[in-house]
Structures are given as C-alpha cells and as structure tokens.
C-alpha cells in the first residue's frame, strides 16, 4: 500500500482571508487521502483548528505587522524591508526542522515566502504578483518575482481572463511560467446550502489592524441607519464567540464556521 503523503498547509495571519481560502484546499487534500498538517499563527491557526479539529497543527510564528493609522505607508514598509527579509530567512530555516519532525512531503504556503524547500514540492498561493505602490514599482515587482521564484509553482486564486477578481495585482505584466491560475477559492460547500431569510444585510470583515477595527466602527454606524435585520461578522477569533445585540435589528459576532456563514449568505 502506498504511503499517505503529508502536506503542510501554512497561511499568513493577516486577517482571516488567507486561512479561509485554504479551507477548500485542505478539504481536497483530505479527499485525496493525504495527511494535512496545519501550520499558522494567531487567529488564522485558531480558526483552522475549529474548522478541522481532528487535524494536527503547529505554530509557525508570523511576521507581526500593524499598519500605520494615517498615511506614510510606503516609507513605513520600506523601513521594514530588512525585517521582512530576515523573517523570510528565519521562516525558511525553521521549515527544515518541521519537515524532519513531521515527515513533510509537500508544502502549500499562502503568502508565507520563507516556506519553500529545495527537495520538497513547494507551492505559493498569492494574488499579489504586482503589488501597487505609488513609486518604486519596478523594484517592488522585482523583489516579489524573486521571492515567487523560490517555489515550484505559484497558484493565483483567480481566473486568467480579463474578467477577473484581482485586477492589476495579478494581471499587470509578464507572468512567470510557474504561475497557475486556479480559479477563485471558496470555503462554502455547495451541498450544505440552507435558506436563512431572516436577515436582510450581512457584513463580513477581515484584515490587519488598525483598519479592521476602523471599518468595523463605520459599518456598525451604517448598519444602524439601515433599520433592518443585519449581522456583522467581525473577523476576530476568540474563545467567547457569542452573538451580541447592538440594537434590536443589528447583531455582531466574532466569526462563523463555514457552514454557519453559508446559511447567512444564502
């Protein structure tokens, strides 16, 4: 009998988007009889552990980045480039021990540029091949291209045609041959659709701070004005995840499982 392959799936912990789009990939790996090891940090790890409680998981420390509250983003991140490269180097070095300890056969890394290996199939998931900056675009694109080239393949969760989701972020220039457009990734299971017509409005948040909190405050004010049944999913994973009534019509909750969120969407 052929030995089951063990695949490390490791999303970035900047909001929950990277973790949630790994859910359909993990499901497909399990369907193909692979062992899956989840490697992440913070809320991304907590969320995937709740989605897949039977899977093994490990903490792979993430680069802690908090966006400035107002302007100066280019300078802010330019000053942190040495720190970014140092983190990528440390991440790459830590992968050797993970591969040895858990007998890893392949790696799927969502925007974690240090998680590649010379002798193991390594895939990077990203839709940011051509990061938009007000200046130094060529330099930034060159850096991203070099980082992407370390992986055997780069999967873009979008379509290749002009009618796409990510726009210039993944369609703005010459695309390396290792890039594969795999189509949008959804954690929703078509078989679990159930109608839930109770609420009229649904807002789903995710992303790095302080922007997530700032947008949450704006959305709460706007949803109050609607005066209809509404639910705000904050995109925050915590032990206490009870729904909170902000008004008679507006309910707020930290996060929802894929199935419960699908009920609200439908």
State each model region's role.
Residues 73-114:
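Conserved nucleotide-sugar donor-binding subdomain of glycosyltransferases
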Residues 19-29, 43-44:
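Short amphipathic alpha-helix
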Residues 118-181:
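Active-site-proximal region of nucleotide-activated glycan assembly enzymes
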